[in-house]
Structure formats: structure tokens, C-alpha cells
Amino acid sequence: MTPIIPEQDIINAAAKGTDAFLQLITEAILQSIDGQLNADNMSKLNAEQITLVAYHLLHEEVMDGGFIQLIHNGLGPFIFMNPFAKVIRLWGQEMEDDEGNVLHDFSKLIYKGRKLFEQYGDELTQPCTDDEFMALFEQYPQFDNLDDEFIENEEDITAAVAHYIDNHLSLFCEVK
């Protein structure tokens, strides 16, 4: 399903910056499927739209609580066991400058996360108290480097994602 976004809304969001631009596109996509991506409505979106929603979810979780939180909250299979990293790498291949390298490096980060998810996912998704959840960060320091790498490169990654979307806007929405 391709959401329709007024051209002036896109212009206004782009003028506010990368985050506002991505938020507008992501919210329009999510609204087109009643606000939440799930197995029942995923087929209504194309691979590009699903990848943007995946990036949005990853960004929110990792910026809030790292990859441990992302996995604990049940997003591990969606992020790591689907072609998210591959699509991000392909987006990067279409870019000629440093942004392509940024997305290529980001895809490698996701593949590293997948290895850790496959190794520790069962333990990290167990129900637990808040104190037990906080203890996971001490028990699994392997995720620290992933968190640090994402946070250090987040602005560049987000800018590259936004640039790709801007260059392929018709894959994400219809502008009226």
C-alpha cells in the first residue's frame, strides 16, 4: 500500500531536517497499515517500505536501550532473520559516495548483531523483572560494541537512509 503525502508536507519536513523527513514517511507508511506492522498486514507493503519501518524500529530500540533491548522486546527475528541487512547493503550499493560505505558498514553491523542474536537470543527474550533486565547489560557485554558503533554512526546512517529515500521517494509514498 502506497501512502499519499502532500508535497508541501514533504517540503516542510525536509526543511526541518533528516529526522523530520524520515518520521513523516515512516508515519505515513505505518498509518497505511493501521499503525503497526504485523504478519497480517506486511504483505500490503513493499520491501523498501518494510525496510524503512525496520530501520525506524531498530533506531528507536537501540537509541533507547541498545541491541539487548531490541532483542528482549521481541524484534530480533524481524531485524536479524529477515533480509533487512541485505536491503540496507543494496541501498548502499546504489550510492556513489561515502553514504554507500556508511550503509555497507551498517549492514555489516546488523550481520554481527545476527550472530549474537543467534547465540544469545533465547536468554535475552525470557520474561524478567526490571532489575533482571538491567542485569542483562552486565551479563552480555558482547553487545556494547554494537551499541557504541551504531550510536557513533547514527547520524550518518540516518542521513544515508534519508538520502536513499529522497532519491527513490515513489517506492515509499505517492506525493500529491
Q: Where are each of the predicted segments found?
A:
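Extended, alpha-helix-rich binding/interface surfaces that flank or overlap catalytic cores
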Residues: 2-85, 97-176
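A conserved position within tetratricopeptide repeats
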Residues: 92-95
